[in-house]
C-alpha cells in the first residue's frame, strides 16, 4: 500500500458515527456495510504499515531531543562549517522507498517519504508558484522571496493577527487552492506519525478569519538558490513540534544537508520531509542556474505564547 493510500485511509476513514444506547438503528444497505468493512480493513492495513515504518526506523544512538532542541538557540552554521562536516547519505533504495531516522530514545527526527509520494501533488505547482510570484511583481528566481501565511501573535496588542503576507490577494487564492490536496496529505502524515502534535495543532486558536492549511496554522513559500540556508528557527513551531517541507522545481543533483544530525539527502520535485523543528538548520546545495521552491507547513512559535494557547499540552516524546 502506497503512502498516498495510507494517508487517505487515515484522513477519511474513521468508521461510522456512534448511536445512543437503546436507539434503534435504521436498516442499512449491503453496499453501506461492505463500504464500512472496506474502510476498517484499510485503516487496519494503514496502521500495520505505519507500525512497520516505525520498527524500521534508523536510530542515532548519540543524538537526543534535548541536545537538538538547544541547537535552536545557536547561530546558523557558516558555509565553512558545513564543508567540515562528514555527512551520511541515504542509499538509493532507501531514498526511493522512504525512510525514518530517530534519536536514541526512538523519537522521530526525520521522515523522508518515498521519492514518488508527492509528485502527484506538485505536477503543475511549479507554474502556479511562478504565476503567484509574478503577480507580486518580484523576480521569480530571487532567493529573497519569502512569504509566510496564516496567524501570528502580536506582542504589542496581545492579540492573534494574520501575518502581513496573508492579506496579499493577487493569485493568492488560486495558489492556496492548488496546494489544498497537498496540505491534506501532509496533515494525514502528521496524524499517523505524530498524533499528539496533530491534536495540539487542532486545538490552537488562530486569528479571526484566518485560514488553516490542513491541520497547520501557517505555511510559507520560499525561493531557494545555490548555497542558501533555509528558513531560520524563529519561524519554526515549538522545539518538540514538527514541520513538513515540500520541494517544488525542475531539479537535478540537488542536495539538502542537515548539520544537526550530519545527514544529507537528494531532492527532486515532490520530495516531502517531516522534520523535527530542532533540526531546522538546513543547507541546500544546488547547481548553478538552478532554483527550487520550498513550501513549509508549520506553527509559528509566537502562537504558543497567546494566553489561550499556553494551556495546550505538547508531549515531548510523541507516541511514535
From Swiss-Prot:
One example of a Gene Ontology biological process annotation: ER-nucleus signaling pathway
Localization: Nucleus, Nucleolus
Domain of life, source organism: Eukaryota
This protein's record includes keyword Cell wall biogenesis/degradation: no
One Gene Ontology cellular component annotation held by this UniProt entry: nucleolus
Keyword annotations of the record: Nucleus
Cysteine disulfide links: none
Disordered: annotated segments: 16-36
Physiological role: Induces a stably inheritable state of calnexin independence called the Cin state when overexpressed.
Name of the molecule in the record: Calnexin-independence factor 1
